[in-house]
């Protein structure tokens, strides 16, 4: 048996004590109790905050959403296959942040701001929290500048202003995304940055939208945030908040941004899934009690803010500029039921809605907007002067036409005035049709609406209205470019009206279509 030397033992112990690294950092740790469907229940973490990031073994993160007496319920961000019962986890003291800034323009990112388009890393200089409090009443400014969508039906009847929230609502396959994509394409050259948030869609659908935006040169001013159907519910729930934070960066620097949430029904479904898995009490349609707050706190962040607010946030770097974030949330209805829980919630939060109908879409009227139900509550004060002046008769003509068309089915003999109204309404309906990816300028809309109001379409066959419009716009852009530029600037006067009348008279007399 080997003899142990007491001095050697004491020397080894002394070395071990000297080499012992003692960390004084206090960490709030817990133990994973269960892992089910992306929801992790944790024992411990006594001082965790609501919404705080929790780090699990293997570099996986989660967010604390349920704070109970004995445990914490957290939702995992991304893949949770490596998380197992008995593993330890710790608080990070941080809330979830995403990258923001100009560097994101032209890129496709996930709900955490990671690039998913294969174009390399995004070198964003700043990050910001995804959950922020909306600007207060004093920080806001009234909506009085337009966002031109480029669709005649929308810009004439339901104008949208910078800082407004305008809901696009309709059944599946009624052209909701088409309206939103046209809005993005039309912002090219206006300085308005666009954020398109795709929630719960097929990856192929998102790729198709991105391809169309690239074809029309609109990706340069657009950020696409995608949480597809294959992504976890947590990502689909967070994506709109991430997109909103990216848009707020531009708003808070005195710039203008437009954000599209496509669509918030899927976000509500994802939130319902998370809430039920967290064992929160279900309410109407099994949604949790705070699903209204989910959408209201998101949509209230879209606003027009005054110059003082911008100056304060930029520490005096940007002076005398107001900023805005305009939101176009999309809601998908089931069989036209706008009285369901989520549609009624979002209708009450937003400043108006564009209602798209299946029957109109199937009848070939696209965009399939129902002019009677669609409304813009604040956009009227933001409408361009020339469009506001000319478009008053359009909504009335369409509303009367639909009423008379329904009535005339039961009447055999109609008087001349009613017949004239029906014919005019039919022509206006035809005139409001517009091909996808072909937005019109203010001047082009003004010419078309003026022609309808002043009776230039009376002797044009309904089937020829589209050809008439194309020929008229081609003629005006080539022969009266100065007049078109003046109207594109938004101005309108008796002199311009006289020039328009003269140009249209000449067109009717000399041109063919």
UniProtKB/Swiss-Prot annotation:
**Which Gene Ontology cellular component terms are annotated?**
plasma membrane; proton-transporting ATP synthase complex
The residues listed in the UniProt record as binding ATP, with positions renumbered to this chain, are: 170-177
**Chief localisation class:** membrane
> What's the name of its gene?
atpA
Q: What is this protein called?
A: ATP synthase subunit alpha
Q: Which reaction does it catalyse?
A: ATP + H2O + 4 H(+)(in) = ADP + phosphate + 5 H(+)(out)
Of which family is this protein a member? Belongs to the ATPase alpha/beta chains family.
Q: How does it sit in the membrane?
A: Peripheral membrane protein
- Asked whether the keyword Lipid metabolism is assigned, the reply is no
In terms of Gene3D superfamilies, this protein maps to: 2.40.30.20, ATP synthase alpha/beta chain, C-terminal domain, P-loop containing nucleotide triphosphate hydrolases
- Keyword ATP-binding set for record: yes
E.C. designation(s): 7.1.2.2
Q: Where is this site: Required for activity?
A: 374
Q: How does it assemble?
A: F-type ATPases have 2 components, CF(1) - the catalytic core - and CF(0) - the membrane proton channel. CF(1) has five subunits: alpha(3), beta(3), gamma(1), delta(1), epsilon(1). CF(0) has three main subunits: a(1), b(2) and c(9-12). The alpha and beta chains form an alternating ring which encloses part of the gamma chain. CF(1) is attached to CF(0) by a central stalk formed by the gamma and epsilon chains, while a peripheral stalk is formed by the delta and b chains.
Taxonomic lineage of the native organism = Bacteria, Pseudomonadati, Pseudomonadota, Gammaproteobacteria, Cellvibrionales
Tell me which Pfam families the record gives: ATP-synt_ab, ATP-synt_ab_C, ATP-synt_ab_N
Q: Which InterPro entries match?
A: ATP_synth_asu-like_sf (IPR023366), ATP_synth_asu_C (IPR000793), ATP_synth_asu_C_sf (IPR038376), ATP_synth_F1_a_nt-bd_dom (IPR033732), ATP_synth_F1_asu (IPR005294), ATPase_F1/V1/A1_a/bsu_N (IPR004100), ATPase_F1/V1/A1_a/bsu_N_sf (IPR036121), ATPase_F1/V1/A1_a/bsu_nucl-bd (IPR000194)
A GO molecular-function annotation = ADP binding
Q: Where in the cell?
A: Cell inner membrane
Q: What does this protein do?
A: Produces ATP from ADP in the presence of a proton gradient across the membrane. The alpha chain is a regulatory subunit.
Q: Which UniProt keywords apply?
A: ATP synthesis, ATP-binding, Cell inner membrane, Cell membrane, CF(1), Hydrogen ion transport, Ion transport, Membrane, Nucleotide-binding, Translocase, Transport
